[in-house]
Amino acid sequence: MRPDIHPEYRQVLFHDLTANTYFLVGSTLKTDRTKLWEDGNTYPYVTLDVSSASHPFYTGKQKQVSKEGQVARFGQRFGQFFNKGKAQS
């Protein structure tokens, strides 16, 4: 391998601001910010808006969108085209 072409791989401290959770993960992400971690070492520090700790899909708090309203609205708009050949009751 050629020297000096690969990014530096190191431990980086990620902070999910929404869930107030910290992750210490190996990464090549560059940052000037640092923070002292629980183990007494100082690591590069990156803030996140969303991670697996706060995203609704991973936390199980994802809301299902009701399709009933969309189907009714479709029927109101285009139902006349489907009912042309049928007898009215």
Curated annotation (Swiss-Prot):
Organism: Aeromonas hydrophila subsp. hydrophila (strain ATCC 7966 / DSM 30187 / BCRC 13018 / CCUG 14551 / JCM 1027 / KCTC 2358 / NCIMB 9240 / NCTC 8049)
Entry GO terms, CC: ribonucleoprotein complex; ribosome
Keywords: Ribonucleoprotein, Ribosomal protein
One biological process term in Gene Ontology: translation
Coiled coil: none
Presence of keyword Ribonucleoprotein: yes
Cystine pairings recorded for this chain: none
Record text on subunit structure and interactions: Part of the 50S ribosomal subunit.
Record-stated family: Belongs to the bacterial ribosomal protein bL31 family. Type B subfamily.
Pfam families noted in UniProt: Ribosomal_L31
Highest taxon above the source species: Bacteria
GO molecular function: structural constituent of ribosome
UniProt keyword Transport present: no
UniProt-recorded name of the protein: Large ribosomal subunit protein bL31B
Gene: rpmE2
